[in-house]
Design a protein with these regions (language model features):
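N-proximal low-complexity "stem/linker" segments adjacent to membrane-targeting elements
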Residues: 2-64
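A short, conserved alpha-helix in the catalytic core of glycosyltransferases
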Residues: 198-200, 204-208, 215-248
């Protein structure tokens, strides 16, 4: 089974934006390379972290940024309320700017703190468990230099700690921070991108005061703060565009603990809860248009592929089809749970947690 099949209708088409034909397209496909005569905007790379358990991963993440063909102006590691870790990073990473999270606990506050400490015209967000290829910034900056483009994201490939389970459906790879089946296979204007490897213009980010600090990832709780940011910027920046590039310039680690059916279910429940919260904040139509398309087109196609695989002798196809049905059902339950409990809740911080 291939995990990279695309929809007949791209997410950009569904959003009413379509595929952009711009001067950066040859950069996005690797056609032009990195020219010395290209005046790239300055970019600050912001990496949030919170635990010493990710120390080796952080080293590899920082090294991948230092190896970029287009150098970053600065690399800022933001430590989320862990003074000992901040001190150690400051000592062990002499070429990195280490700063504390001066906002609310969690990755949204950490990213906002990183932006406040940065100087670049563009801010790039990278997770501490991700590894960028050397052309990551070159490819994405090619898009963000295009008039009207406020931000850009890219394909994130899975770096599995244990073998990928045969039952795991590619349509739900987003639950583990990896790009999922059905995404556009050409540079496309989309509703939102993801913060595991996002570039955004500082001016646009500051226009909406950054991420909501009571809505995002805190420990094992994970809400769609990246989608919320993209929607809020699009609402205030007239004719602004978010770009998606399918170039595989990012790898995201998938710990063995996330390669389980239990994690998939808990993550989907929380995502449904978060989408309901976001619909309340940003409007139902804007917040759920792509999700409704995903549920109506991408998931049924995935179930069909799994059944077809099983008919050809790949019994694991039944597992993938069953997992799609179960995961979608749990996400719907999470959405419904938010609606039931919302009269008694004051803020998103009361969200349930996903299992690690």
């Amino acid at each position: 089974m291939s995990y990279d099949e695309s929809n007949e209708e791209t997410l950009g088409d569904k959003a009413g934006i379509g595929v952009m034909k711009d001067s950066a397209s040859d950069v996005a496909t690797g056609g032009s390379g990195v020219g010395e005569d290209v005046a790239y905007p300055t970019v600050s790379v912001i990496i949030p972290t919170y635990t010493k358990a990710r120390w080796d991963w952080l080293h590899e993440c920082v090294a991948s940024v230092q190896a970029q063909l287009v150098p970053a102006l600065e690399i800022i590691v933001v430590v989320d309320h862990n003074p000992e870790l901040l001190e150690e990073i400051s000592r062990e990473f002499p070429d990195v700017i280490a700063v504390p999270n001066i906002g609310g606990r969690g990755v949204s506050g950490a990213r906002n703190s990183g932006v406040k400490a940065s100087r670049g015209e563009v801010v790039a967000f990278l997770d501490d468990d991700s590894i960028a290829t050397p052309d990551w910034l070159a490819i994405l900056l090619g898009h963000i230099m295009t008039p009207g483009v406020v931000g850009v994201g890219c394909y994130s490939d899975g770096l599995w700690e244990s073998p990928r389970p045969s039952w795991f459906p590619g349509e739900f790879s987003w639950t583990i921070g990896v790009s999922y089946s059905g995404l556009p296979q050409a540079p496309t204007a989309v509703r939102n991108v993801w913060t595991s490897a996002m570039l955004v213009k500082r001016s646009a980010f500051e226009l909406v005061d950054g991420f909501r600090e009571d809505f995002g990832k805190i420990g094992n709780k994970s809400l769609p703060e990246d989608t919320d940011l993209c929607l809020r910027i699009a609402a205030v920046e007239e004719n602004s565009v978010w770009m998606w590039d399918p170039a595989k310039v990012m790898q995201h680690r998938v710990p063995a603990g996330r390669a389980t059916f239990g994690y998939l279910m808990s993550r989907c429940f929380l995502q449904g809860w978060g989408k309901a919260a976001m619909a309340r904040m940003d409007g139902f139509d804007e917040s759920t248009a792509l999700e409704r398309h995903y549920a109506a087109r991408t998931l049924p196609a995935g179930v069909g592929r799994g059944l077809a695989d099983a008919a050809r002798g790949d019994i694991s196809g039944l597992g993938r089809s069953g997992a799609i049905v179960a995961a979608f059902s749990v996400a719907v339950a999470g959405y419904a749970w938010y609606l039931v409990e919302s009269p008694f809740r004051k803020k998103a911080d009361s969200a349930p947690s996903a299992t690690a």
